[in-house]
Amino acid sequence: MTAKDVAQSLSERIAPYADVRVVGIPRALMYHRLGTKWRTFFEALGREVVLSPASDRAVFERGQLLSVDECCLTSKLYLGHVAAVAPLCDAVFVPSFALPGTFRSYCTKFQALPDLVTNAFALVDEPVRVMSALIAEGADDKTEREGYVSLGIQLGATAKEARLAWKQAKKAQEERDAALAEAQRDLVRRIRKVPEGARPLTILVSSHPYVAHDPFVGGTVTDALRAAGAEVLFADEFDHAKALKKADEFSRSLPWIVNRELVGAILSLHEYVDGIVLMSAFPCGPDSMTNDAIARCVRGKPILTLTLDAQSGSAGVETRVESFVDILTYQKRGGYFHE
């Protein structure tokens, strides 16, 4: 082996993704929470970013064929998005989520996601080039930055360039989150200014962002609520830091950071809404525990619990939502005995 070969081999180990010019990001799972950060990071390093198309039945069915039965609905959908974006890019970004703290963890599927994707496609002899990194979202800045700097170096950037890209990405994500939280506060203020008798029905939708904001998963529910004339608030758009602090009033031992944020948002927005919709994708473990506790312990507002799966027809979901809205409307008017 020549010196040139040794140097090339060493370079490939240090920067295995240096040849990647187009990065594919599946439009599923944590893209709905962190997509702004990821896109900004890669673009700051001079990469082009392409997204998979919006979710639909075809994308899901492709993912279902690649998945085992035990995977949750959104994991199956994710595999479909990987299949859709893989031909459009040099590598697909599939991060692995570290556990930044005892009460700031994520569902364990996020740790194993790169292995899940790699093996699912290998089993059908359709290998996909996966670009991964261990990132600690929700940890302190130093710990989180280390994961992104490591990824940047693997892309061939210097540590300084990677730190700058992370800084830009973090700022863009914070601005996006702050804008959503401010828009929600503004909507609540505008609703409160309307006289009680003319105030629209206001419903809080609580679910993971990859359920609430995915057109194939939660889109039917939010569309049905709006079609019925309701104003819809999303728990995941509430200020994350305030939600985490408020969640301590509900439980100090709830381990999953996103579920803690959702609980805190429910407690914070409780007095401003007429009803709450709890949505989860079958068979989500964290949601099954958290939503049951919410239904038992959060009092004073009607709650509709929806568990969505591949067999959930839109007609059935729409019927349940419409019935829930009808009940809330009657209640708002004073019950069945109003004049």
Model-inferred region functions:
Residues M1-E339:
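An N-terminal assembly and electron-transfer interface module characteristic of large anaerobic redox
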